């Protein structure tokens, strides 16, 4: 893989971002995927430094004040941010980097790093997105309703992105993302 630098992947909750990124990493372990910091508590099975860097609100605020994030935003009542130093180190070393972040974070990265490639992952249909979110069985109807309200806003913003990938098949979506990352 010839690295093109930084690729930012965004899309609504339930569209399959984690699954597509995992498929990319499975075939291309040389792609570095940023580990975000968050104030949300770890879920069962999550390990600090693997899925997220888990920090308390005070530490997160300190990191924001110190300029340690490329982007940061509130989502679902918790703060999330992309640590600046590891990203810049990998980019300087020529490592292809992938950020999987939400819309507000993507907008911040576009302001700070406009040379990045911005990719929006979209569901085949809104009904399919509803099916995926409800099929998880992990969230209350109220949380799902909030996520769907947010998804409508995010879907309306897809024109802000350089490319749109419809995730109707994980392997195809991952292959398309890799093709965009290497510029083919």
UniProtKB/Swiss-Prot annotation:
Chain positions recorded as ATP binding sites: 11-18
Substrates-to-products reaction catalysed: GMP + ATP = GDP + ADP
Entry's family note: Belongs to the guanylate kinase family.
Listed CDD domains: GMPK
Domain Guanylate kinase-like, first and last residues per copy: 4-182
Organism whose genome encodes this protein: Frankia casuarinae (strain DSM 45818 / CECT 9043 / HFP020203 / CcI3)
Primary role: Essential for recycling GMP and indirectly, cGMP.
Keywords associated with the record: ATP-binding, Cytoplasm, Kinase, Nucleotide-binding, Transferase
UniProt-listed Enzyme Commission number(s): 2.7.4.8
CC per GO annotation: cytosol
Subcellular location as annotated: Cytoplasm
Keyword ATP-binding: yes
Main location: cytoplasm
Name assigned to this protein: Guanylate kinase
InterPro entries for this protein: GK/Ca_channel_bsu, Guanylate_kin-like_dom, Guanylate_kinase, Guanylate_kinase_CS, P-loop_NTPase
């Amino acid at each position: 893989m010839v690295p093109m630098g930084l690729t930012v992947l965004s899309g609504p909750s339930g569209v399959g971002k984690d699954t597509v990124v995992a498929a990319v990493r499975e075939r291309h372990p040389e792609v570095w995927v940023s580990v975000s910091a968050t104030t949300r508590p770890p879920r069962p099975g999550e390990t600090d430094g693997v899925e997220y860097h888990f920090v308390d609100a005070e530490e997160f605020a300190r990191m924001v004040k110190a300029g340690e994030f490329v982007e940061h935003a509130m989502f679902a009542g918790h703060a999330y941010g992309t640590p600046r130093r590891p990203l810049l180190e990998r980019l300087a070393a020529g490592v292809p980097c992938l950020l999987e972040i939400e819309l507000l974070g993507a907008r911040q990265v576009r302001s700070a790093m406009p040379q990045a490639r911005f990719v929006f992952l979209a569901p085949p249909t809104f009904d399919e997105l509803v099916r995926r979110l409800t099929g998880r069985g992990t969230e209350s109807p109220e949380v799902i309703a909030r996520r769907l309200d947010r998804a409508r806003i995010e879907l309306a913003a897809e024109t802000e992105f350089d490319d749109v990938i419809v995730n109707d098949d994980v392997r195809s979506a991952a292959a398309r993302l890799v093709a965009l990352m290497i510029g083919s």
